[in-house]
Amino acid sequence: MSSHLSQDANMNGVYVRSDVSSMLSFDGSESRESMDDSKKGHQSLVEWLNETLPYLKLPWEASEDELRACLRDGTVLCSLLNQLSPGSMRMGGSFEPASVKIERFLTAMDEMALPRFEVSDIEQGDMVPVLQSLKALKASFSDGSYDKNSLAARRRWSLPEDHSDSRGDDRNFTDGFQSKEGSEIDMSDAKISDLLKSNSLRNAPTRSLFDMLDKLLDESMTKMNGHVSHAMASLLSALVQVIEQRISNQADNLKNQNILFRVREEKYRSRIKVLESLAAGTTKENEIVTNCMEHIKLEKTRIEEKERSEEKDVVRLRKEKERSDAEIRQLKQELKLVKETHENQCLELEAKAQKTRDELEKKLKDAELHVVDSSRKVKELEKLCQSKSQRWEKKECIYQNFIDNHSGALQELSATSLSIKHEVVRTQRKYFEDLNYYGLKLKGVADAAKNYHVVLEENRRLYNEVQELKGNIRVYCRIRPFLPGQNSRQTTIEYIGETGELVVANPFKQGKDTHRLFKFNKVFDQAATQEEVFLDTRPLIRSILDGYNVCIFAYGQTGSGKTYTMSGPSITSKEDWGVNYRALNDLFLLTQSRQNTVMYEVGVQMVEIYNEQVRDILSDGGSSRRLGIWNTALPNGLAVPDASMHCVRSTEDVLELMNIGLMNRTVGATALNERSSRSHCVLSVHVRGVDVETDSILRGSLHLVDLAGSERVDRSEATGERLKEAQHINKSLSALGDVIFALAHKNPHVPYRNSKLTQVLQSSLGGQAKTLMFVQVNPDGDSYAETVSTLKFAERVSGVELGAAKSSKEGRDVRQLMEQVSNLKDVIAKKDEELQNFQKVKGNNATSLKRGLSNLRLVGPTSPRRHSIGASPNARRGKASGLFGRGTSDVDNCSEYSSKHSDSGSQQSSDERKHQKDYHQPSKFAGAAKGIDFDDEDVELVGLADADSEDRLSDISDSCLSMGTETDGSISSAVELTLFPETAKPLELIERPEARMTSEKLEKSVKMGKTEPKDRTNIPSKIPKQTLKPPGQTRPSRLSIATSSSSKALTGAKRPTISTSSSAKPLNRRR
């Protein structure tokens, strides 16, 4: 025994020495290797993290601080575990705290029996436990020991199963239970009682018990709606007791194993001490002891690992026990709630049953009473039926007698019915005959009704022809649609008729007085397009090429769409073109279609009237230049001759010119319109055509007028320059209204001179021209007053009769006569020079000659811009070539523009003026014989204060004799007045003693005037006479009287004064 102890001691000494030597060697050279290994392990861990989660992109040599920053919020740890085992971790929201995520990760590590770390380690502590835990996780998933379902399997109920010998005994329970996993469990009371009586629950595996518990709970919650029977509750309590007993037995076993492990540990420690005491033995013994020590160390490490695993199992079992205890408590609470619910339902059912029983008893008593009452009523009804049957028998006898009495009457009625039937057939036959007769009549009426629309259209055409013959101003009304964003506003338009009726009403007032009816030639509604508006205007446009003068102007308040109708919103789109562009485009198309028969030339002028100033907006100098106006339009329709005339040959030329004009036109912003026209714009198109065969000349003009809108200052909020412009606009439109009023009432005096606008439109409003007015209406309810005022003005305009329009056509004979007149005027000019020389010689006759000169000077005002008579006819014709020079030549040939007056002509006395008035009385009668009505004011002459003003053109006012659009008549009158002037009175003056002339030159100069004016018509001449007009017609167009040969013979060298609408002072300055 002692030898055995000594041997053990020696072995212990060997083990101790070998252990010490091994520890020394570890402290020495192996420390470097361990550092290298730890470094490599750290790098491999970083590499594994980057491979598992590619989005981390950690550096290869990442420090512990970098790893701490990456893993601190717990998201990377949870994502890592989900990546390794999908679905094992429940990911929370982005606002979940980091500590909750880390605790969830640590719980999963505990379930997998892997080393864990504390939350404080990853936040501020040492990172070694964290790295060890991650390395263990890497190793567990790298060697393939965990599959995808390993973590999910660990999350289930993981209590250890009882591996006793009873496994074979409870196989029947397990097989019977597992056979029902795919189907429903038998929940009958008999089955549950058999399970409780048998020992199969106690012998069954723990996992089977938990699965059965889960299925029973699921079945009770889904199929029984929370109602648990008493047998089911007993089964659940038995299952819970068995599970609690097994958990307690497992805990006792773990305690016993811990005690056994501690005993073994003490035993091994004692052996280690003994071996350490025997470590001083021989080398062989040391080797033996060393081997024994290594073996013991291995066993020790194995035992320690087993202890750690058992401790973990204990911890896990404790947690599972706590979890099962919580579930058991929850099940008990649910069971208690189910029992209480069941008891409450039983009480409710018992109460309902008692209530139903009481109600049934009450109904039974009521039924018995009802049966007694019914039997009593049956007896009463039997008695009543017997009495009624007797009564009906008596009535039957009475009715039988009645039927017998009336049977004879019925036979008589049948005979009468037969006769009535024959009468009805005869009447029906007559009705059919009448029906056929009236059908024929109705067919005739229907045929007449079919032709009604044709007759109506013919009446409308005849009405238009009558309007054409009367020369009425056509009025088309166009209603502007609401602007974007204004559809919710109230409108003033109540009704739009097909034949030009328009009814407006004030939406803010009720009653019949608020409705107003207007009648125009045509009314365009809000949906009318530019093309539809132009289609009704096209016949007027085409008449220009036939030699007629046409004027189209737009009238309305500001912002009502006048510029939109006349010009359009844009010239880029052909659909948006206004009347201006479409009219010129149509003119060019017609000229091209007629180019084989008539050669046309088209010229365009564009001026604006801004603040009572006429400006040329197509000239290079812009609108700064002020132009004068001819109140008497020239034969070619030029009302503003000094405005630049541009020859156009295509629509593109017109678009370019009009674009320049619109850019130069004055516009401004007001409260009602962002781009309000602040001036009246007049686009004049002059057409001259020459017939290829007959060489006859056709002259037509088209005036397209875009009037500035009338506006109320309180609504437009105009101030400063805008206010001044608004005042001028309203003043000019008011003057236009006065002219329309005078024309509508056929007043003898029409105030054209009140405004530049009316002077420009004088030839269109006062002459025989075709005139059309577009009246623009704003449908907004706030503009009701302006709308009614505009429509009233348009209604007055529609009643104006201008007379039938006439074509301006010159034949070849007329041109020859005009040339003869020009030659005669040259001869007269030479006679004037001879007469002036004679006056210097005969100074004693100066007084009588002054009187004659004064009388004749008053008749013919001339323009400072015209050629003098002394110029050669060829020179004058050279300046009058083509479209734009012909009008000037005609005016030179037909008007009174002659040589200068003498100095004495401007210093006449009041006696001489009185004598002039008496002297010209015969001239007035002579003019009446010709069909021309010369008033006293027709021979008045007014001039400018400054005769040298080059910016003003001579302006013959409407009180003077004016030239109308009847070109043939006016030219013939001009020729007659030029060739046969009134010279009777001058001859009497010359024959007086104080003014006797004996020179042969004087006799030659007055040789043509010896006959009386009444005998002039008897003189044979090729010049056509002016036709007489009936007295009921409007006042004929008047021609300014040209200075005759005798007047030129008596006039001096001084140029006559000029007249404009802005000055009325005679010119007294000597030359």
Swiss-Prot record:
Give a yes or no for keyword Zinc-finger in this entry.
Answer: no
Q: Which parts of this chain are annotated as the region Disordered?
A: 157-181, 852-931, 995-1071
The UniProt regions of compositional bias labelled Basic and acidic residues, in chain numbering, are: 158-173, 910-921, 995-1017
Q: Which residues form the Calponin-homology (CH) domain?
A: 39-142
Q: Which stretches are annotated as coiled coil? A: 299-389, 811-844
Q: Where is the composition biased (Polar residues)?
A: 1034-1049
Q: Pfam families, per this entry? A: CH, Kinesin
Matching entries from Gene3D superfamilies are given as:
Calponin-like domain, Kinesin motor domain
Instruction: Give binding positions for ATP.
Output: 556-563
Q: Which residues form the Kinesin motor domain?
A: 472-800
Which keywords fit this entry according to its UniProt record?
A: ATP-binding, Coiled coil, Microtubule, Motor protein, Nucleotide-binding
Query: Please, which domain of life does this record's source organism belong to?
Result: Eukaryota
* GO (cellular component) term, any one: microtubule
Task: Give any GO molecular function from the UniProt entry.
Answer: microtubule motor activity
User: Biological process GO annotation list?
Assistant: microtubule-based movement
- Keyword check for Signal: no
- Family the entry assigns: Belongs to the TRAFAC class myosin-kinesin ATPase superfamily. Kinesin family. KIN-14 subfamily.
Write the protein's name: Kinesin-like protein KIN-14J
Q: What is the lineage of its organism?
A: Eukaryota, Viridiplantae, Streptophyta, Embryophyta, Tracheophyta
| Gene designation per UniProt | KIN14J
